[in-house]
Amino acid sequence: MPDGEASHATVVADAAGNRSLLKWWQTAGGELDSLDHIERVMPIVERLRGRGYPAPHHLLTASAESLLFVLQELLPGRPPVPLLPVHVEQLVELNRLQQEQRGDGGGWGSFLCRTLVTGADGYCLHAPLRQHSPAGAALLDRVIAIGEATDPAALPVAGIAHFDFHHLNVLAEGDRITGIVDCEGARVGDPCFDLVTLLYCSAEGGLGDDEQLQLWQLLRDRRDAATLRAYLAHMSLRLSSWSAVHHDDATTARWLAHSQMWLDRV
């Protein structure tokens, strides 16, 4: 899920023993957790799969009693922890498959800026940060200022954004990437946003400092400072506010410091 840690999953099998993955989560009326949204996303994911992108094949979507269910192909592998340079190299190449020339009527930039200035449905929440601590309030003020200073039309629409492209949504067997999962947040947008997400979360995955700097340089070569600042502000708000709601104060303080560190770089 785009807001993180919000879904459940189990492996199921049919009468013939064919195994699939069943995911489900509580719907809350948000823009990203409806049956209609999932049905809009699946053609986007299938478009990627047609290019060789290792996302799971979608089998079924259903809803019942405020729960949303997704049945999909079970892919091999486990999240790569530690995240190694060989994994990052493959993920950067897979990210190229997300590139395409397709307009969205300004939807991507408006959506991204809105998450900064007012928040989103169920994630990027402002109140938890404002109430958490002076450090949380300071980060929120910084994020809002970035959102207000960002021209939505200037944020590139260059293909498809997975929108939750961190190492725990990657599967690998040894050095080889075998899958990209949790694609329910995919949307027309900027594939480079996903590389910012990967970078922002890469220290948690154990990627070394030198390798993080290499990925950062790649991003600086591809996008201007204003775009990277907006993307990092989104990730800072998203992870810090989620932590303020769901984690202890020490964990939240760590995310707050991590966020300020990355924002200071742009």
Where are these regions (language model features)?
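Conserved hydrophobic "DFG−1" position in protein kinase catalytic cores
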Residues: 11-13, 24, 60, 71-76, ...
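A conserved alpha-helical element in kinase catalytic cores
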Residues: 19-65, 78-94
